[in-house]
Amino acid sequence: MAVRRLNHAVLYIREVDRAVDFYTDTLQFVVAHHIPGRAAFLRASDTENDHDLGLFALGDEAAGPQPGNVGLYHLAWEVGTLGELAETGRRLQSRNALVGASDHLMSKSFYAKDPDGIEFEVMWRVPRADWPESGDMRPHPLDLDAAIAHWGADLATGAAAGSPT
């Protein structure tokens, strides 16, 4: 049997309460389980998972991520609409966490870093019928206003539209 999808991610972080505050504020995760000072398990609002993100605290002296080394580059969290992407971008900007924005033609994305410097992507999936034939994944500048003008702020795609993956 083949893998169907990623079920959850677990991150090592320095301090659990700071990370919980960040992820619940910016990405609107809810706390499913909390082990004070040690770990937390967060759930996306519309998931059927017990948790989608685990956070394990290592302490303030732990080294941060090292860009350019072998390992995980980033996780991509999917939102359902361009309106949700815009709102998430505003929350990330208000926390000075936003580090980039890209149009991958098949998705519209913001890139950010959490308080421990762990990079992640928040993306909206372009409707499959509008994907380019070439599969070009090179990043292009994101024009979110133009995307909203084209598809509207409330068009649900991906998991929000019932896609199993």
Predicted regions and their residues:
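Short active-site oxyanion
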Residues: 7-8
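Short glycine/proline-enriched turns and hinge-like loops at secondary-structure junctions
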Residues: 35, 66-68
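Short beta-strand/turn micro-motifs at beta-sheet edges
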Residues: 60-66
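Core segments of cupin and vicinal oxygen chelate
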Residues: 11-57
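Short, charged/polar surface micro-motifs in flexible loops or helix N-caps
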Residues: 47-50, 60, 80-85
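Vicinal oxygen chelate
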Residues: 4, 13-18, 69-70, 75-119, ...
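Acetyl-CoA-dependent GNAT
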Residues: 57-60, 125
